[in-house]
Regions:
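N-proximal, solvent-exposed amphipathic alpha-helical segments enriched in charged/polar residues
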Residues: 1-34, 69
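Residue-level signature of catalytic and energy-coupling elements of molecular machines
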Residues: 12, 30, 66, 99, ...
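Extreme N-terminal, non-catalytic leader segments
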Residues: 26-29, 37-41, 47-106
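Conserved catalytic-core segment of NTP-binding enzymes
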Residues: 59-60, 213-306, 312-315
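Walker A/P-loop phosphate-binding motif and the immediately C-terminal alpha-helix
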Residues: 101-139, 248, 258, 267
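Phosphate-binding loop that captures ATP/GTP phosphates
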Residues: 125-191, 197
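Switch II (G3) loop of P-loop NTPases
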Residues: 155-158, 179-194, 201-229, 234
């Protein structure tokens, strides 16, 4: 039996690309380079993206189909060659080359206002005239779409330099991306660690962030695979830790670990004191006084700022209007002061 290209194409036409209903030939995935020598054959398959999740299974199915239709005496020379239309994502360490400073916003535990700090710090930096991007890396509990009042936004992709790039949403002078834009807000995100990390890498490496002075990453509370993904994927400038005193040590120790080695830019004491609206000059230290200052001295890191408990912070966050937008308020001034302290670091 003689082999010729049409027999190979007929075999490949029985393999369908998942989710499209088209076979490999119809989908234009078989390059016109089929090479045959006796019973030896080699050819190339074309995929849209280098990260195509079906690449391995499709290649295996193509190989099996040829052997099934043309006989096991057929030898596929080497591996089936794979080519991609979309350019490959840059290597780790070369991502975001146009970003000057990459800062993680972290906390040792949840419920300390880390995301509030991240959102308002981003807005405050933008008000100071800097180009700012904010990535909501809290994959399992994204909050930035609500805090910026862009819950209905759906980022789209554009072809840039041969790659499909996600265009970040812009609000209050901040470029913003969150997994919350791509999932149903009423459904739990039931992903294993690897899936979450891959989604995060896409939001970092497959997005058109452009030139930025500051790229802030709102990390999940505690320590997790997401934190490791970020520090292994990006050249971090440093981290800002929102303080819940006992757990802040864990966050600091994670970043200063020899395997991670990300500088701590400083601490932010959120909920430092309570000031009621009717008594704006009063401060009630309901969680104790100077705890963050003592921790900063103990850990030899700066105390970048103190944010009071004020009803408007929560209310404005729920409305999607960060308090840092209004520099005439006590909280607005507090976040602008924090932004200036971060810049000095």
């Amino acid at each position: 039996m003689a082999l010729y290209p049409k027999l190979i194409l007929d075999a490949l036409a029985t393999v369908r690309y998942p989710g499209t209903g088209k076979n490999l030939v119809e989908a234009g995935m078989v390059e016109d380079d089929i090479r045959i020598e006796g019973m030896k054959v080699s050819f190339s398959l074309i995929f849209e993206k280098p990260t195509d999740p079906f690449m391995k299974s499709v290649v295996k199915a193509a190989e099996t189909s040829i052997l099934t239709h043309e006989g096991k005496e057929v030898e596929i020379v080497g591996n089936i060659s794979v080519k991609t239309v979309q350019a490959a994502r840059p290597e780790v360490g070369k991502l975001l080359p146009q970003v000057k400073n990459i800062i993680g916003i972290s906390s040792g535990k949840g419920g300390v206002g880390k995301s509030t700090v991240a959102a308002n710090l981003a807005v405050a930096l933008a008000k100071l005239g800097y180009k700012v991007g904010l990535l909501d890396a809290d994959i399992f509990g994204p909050s930035m779409p609500k805090m910026f009042q862009v819950e209905d936004a759906r980022p789209y992709a554009e072809k840039i330099d041969g790659r499909d790039m996600i265009i970040p949403v812009e609000k209050y002078g901040v470029k913003l991306l969150s997994i919350g834009f791509f999932v149903d807000p009423d459904q739990a995100t039931l992903w294993r660690g690897g899936m979450a990390s891959n989604a995060l890498k896409q939001l970092i490496g497959d997005a058109a962030w452009g030139e930025l002075d500051y790229f802030l990453i709102d990390l999940p509370p505690g320590t997790s695979d997401i934190h490791l993904t970020v520090v292994q994927t990006l050249a971090m400038t440093g981290a800002v830790v929102a303080v819940a005193l006992a757990d802040a040590r864990k966050g600091i120790n994670m970043f200063t670990n020899d395997k991670v080695n990300v500088p701590i830019l400083g601490l932010v004491e959120n909920m430092a004191w309570f000031t009621p609206a009717e008594l704006p000059d009063n401060k009630y230290y309901i969680f104790g006084r100077e705890g963050a200052k003592k921790l900063a001295e103990e850990m030899n890191v700066p105390l970048l700022g103190q944010i009071p408990i004020v009803q408007s912070i929560c209310e404005n966050g729920d409305k999607g209007t960060p308090v840092a937008l209004d520099e005439n308020t006590m909280t607005g001034r507090a976040f602008l002061s924090l932004a200036a302290a971060v810049v000095r670091q």
